[in-house]
From Swiss-Prot:
The gene is EDNRB. This is Endothelin receptor type B. It comes from Canis lupus familiaris (Dog). The modification Phosphoserine is found at residues 305, 419, 440-442. A lipid is attached at residues 402-403, 405 (S-palmitoyl cysteine). One of its GO terms (biological process) is regulation of blood pressure. Residues 27-101, 164-175, 244-271, 351-362 are extracellular. Residues 1-26 form the signal peptide. It comes from the Eukaryota. InterPro entries: Endthln_rcpt (IPR000499), ETB_rcpt (IPR001112), GPCR_endothelin_rcpt (IPR051193), GPCR_Rhodpsn (IPR000276), GPCR_Rhodpsn_7TM (IPR017452). The chain crosses the membrane at residues 102-126, 138-163, 176-197, 219-243, 272-296, 325-350, 363-389. Glycans are attached at residue 59. Residues 69-88 are annotated as: Disordered.
Length: 442
């Protein structure tokens, strides 16, 4: 008769059997194997699966709202872990995505061509024509340069991402693309604010003659605009990352604002991002423009009765520049309003647990796609607005586009030469007028 096995031997056999059974049970339940890179199921970041394929620039909060809803405490037994239920997916979102995929592609290609031609021509006009080198035009050139960077780098990658669905460009480009996009928008916003303030200073300070050349304060403004825009875009580069998801039986790499942020600041930024974008990148330029243009109008009405004939031409030129700046701000507001409106409506009135939410979600998706296209148009529409509003820019555009390969100074129109001479004569007449007033008052 053999001795019974020891207690340690029995425990060892039981442990081996338990490990084997747990491994088999885990494989049957479909648990993913360990891997070097994190793999998230679609339900962990967004549901339904159609949300994984939204183009860059769409509402990030639409993805956040699609997390599985938690079962109320009263509906689960005591001591049991919280369970989640997913609301039924909205089938209409797939049709909306397929419809706008090609619309976005056509609009992006149009913006790419018009934006490169228009902004490059605008920069060449200001660089070649000495009569156009002044404070407001240098700010407009800074705005055009920011739009040009966004068009060259962001738009081609965005179109590829929209059509190919997978992100093959790596983590570096995943962080660089949203960084450049936000920096470009920041340059646009701060440049419009600086232009509005500059127009008020030009009207309020009649002794401040607009001459040829870049004032030192304008150069400082441009440096500050670019530095602040780059700093404010850093959270985008920090927060965006690549995530691998399981989508319809295949693994897709997507680039988005990561659902889990490491630092408290980035968690706060992810939560308050939509409100921050709406307040700073949309409401701020409109509020500053409305404030300073109201002051400028009051100043012009107050001094209108004391205007002299010698100032008429000089005043007309300043009014034309003020009208041009106002049109740029108006175009900016119209282009960005749909996108910000969809984000705010999503944050305020959308309920992910509402069984009748699909109609509202379809409306918000359509508004979101329209907003993306309108925001892209803002990168190419500023040169067109300048061509339609300003006579001087219109003449320069015609001359520059007709003789792109030749020297602009040799082929500039006679009207521009006369405008420069007339501008200098007006400044000289204004100086004489101020001197005569000074001696007469003495």
């Amino acid at each position: 008769m053999q001795p019974p096995p020891s207690l340690c031997g029995r425990a060892l056999v039981a442990l081996v059997l338990a490990c084997g059974l747990s491994r088999i049970w885990g494989e049957e339940r479909g648990f993913p194997p360990d891997r070097a890179t994190p793999l998230l199921q679609t339900a962990e970041i967004m549901t339904p699966p159609t949300k994984t394929l939204w183009p860059k620039g769409s509402n990030a909060s639409l993805a956040r709202s699609l997390a599985p809803a938690e079962v109320p405490k009263g509906d689960r037994t005591a001591g049991s872990p919280p369970r989640t239920i997913s609301p039924p997916p909205c089938e209409g979102s797939i049709e909306i995505k397929e419809t706008f995929k090609y619309i976005n592609t056509v609009v992006s290609c149009l913006v790419f061509v018009l934006g490169i031609i228009g902004n490059s021509t605008l920069l060449r006009i200001i660089y070649k024509n000495k009569c156009m080198r002044n404070g407001p035009n240098i700010l407009i050139a800074s705005l055009a340069l920011g739009d040009l960077l966004h068009i060259i780098i962001d738009i081609p990658i965005t179109v590829y991402k929209l059509l190919a669905e997978d992100w093959p460009f790596g983590v570096e480009m995943c962080k660089l693309v949203p960084f450049i996009q936000k920096a470009s928008v920041g340059i646009t916003v701060l440049s419009l604010c600086a232009l509005s303030i500059d127009r008020y200073r030009a009207v309020a300070s009649w002794s401040r003659i607009k001459g040829i050349g870049v004032p030192k304060w304008t150069a400082v403004e441009i440096v500050l605009i670019w530095v602040v825009s780059v700093v404010l875009a850093v959270p985008e580069a920090v927060g965006f990352d690549m995530i691998t998801i399981d989508y319809k039986g295949r693994y897709l790499r997507i680039c988005l604002l990561h659902p889990t942020q490491k630092t408290a600041f980035m968690q706060f930024y992810k939560t308050a991002k939509d409100w921050w974008l709406f307040s700073f990148y949309f409401c701020l330029p409109l509020a500053i423009t409305a404030f300073f243009y109201t002051l400028m109008t009051c100043e012009m009405l107050r001094k209108k009765s004391g205007m002299q004939i010698a100032l008429n031409d000089h005043l007309k030129q300043r009014r034309e520049v003020a009208k041009t700046v106002f049109c740029l701000v108006l175009v900016f507001a119209l282009c960005w309003l749909p996108l910000h409106l969809s984000r705010i409506l999503k944050l305020t009135i959308y309920d992910q647990n509402d069984p009748n939410r699909c109609e509202l979600l379809s409306f918000l998706l359509v508004l979101d796609y329209i907003g993306i296209n309108m925001a892209s148009l803002n990168s190419c529409i500023n040169p067109i607005a300048l061509y339609l509003v300003s006579k001087r820019f219109k003449n320069c555009f015609k001359s520059c586009l007709c003789c792109w390969c030749q020297s602009f100074e040799e082929k500039q129109s006679l009207e521009e030469k006369q405008s420069c001479l007339k501008f200098k004569a007006n400044d000289h007449g204004y100086d004489n007028f101020r001197s005569s007033n000074k001696y007469s008052s003495s």
